[in-house]
Curated annotation (Swiss-Prot):
Phylogenetic lineage: Bacteria, Pseudomonadati, Pseudomonadota, Betaproteobacteria, Neisseriales
InterPro entries for this protein: Restrct_endonuc-II-like, tRNA_endonuc-like_dom_sf, UPF0102_YraN-like
SUPFAM superfamilies named among the record's database cross-references: Restriction endonuclease-like
GO molecular function (one): nucleic acid binding
A Pfam match: UPF0102
Protein name: UPF0102 protein NGO_1987
Family designation: Belongs to the UPF0102 family.
Coiled coil ranges: none
Transmembrane segments annotated in the record for this chain: none
Species annotation: Neisseria gonorrhoeae (strain ATCC 700825 / FA 1090)
HAMAP family according to UniProt: UPF0102 (MF_00048)
PANTHER family: UPF0102 PROTEIN YRAN
Amino acid sequence: MRLNHKQGTAGEDAALAFLQSQGCTLLARNWHCAYGEIDLIVKNGGMILFVEVKYRKNQRFGGAAYSISPSKLLKLQRSVEYYLQQNRLTNVPCRLDAVLIEGNRPPEWIKNITG
């Protein structure tokens, strides 16, 4: 297993543990479709959260938040729409979030990354 993949998996594990400590329940992990991948899909109360996880060893090159590009955001939005259609989830409150992990700092939960 490549180092980046191991770090990504460890980052997702940490993000999931953090979200579960905040009351979230896992629905899916590494969900794929033609538009891309959603790292974590969780339920928090009555809301479905689609979560992009970004891990960086340090803040060099802008840190974890900097790595969510406009093209990545578009892929995520299309993936979310596809997930909702495929699962026939209409009129279900949902949100696209990010959990950022940098080095040994606690995870940072950014809610509603689409604005």
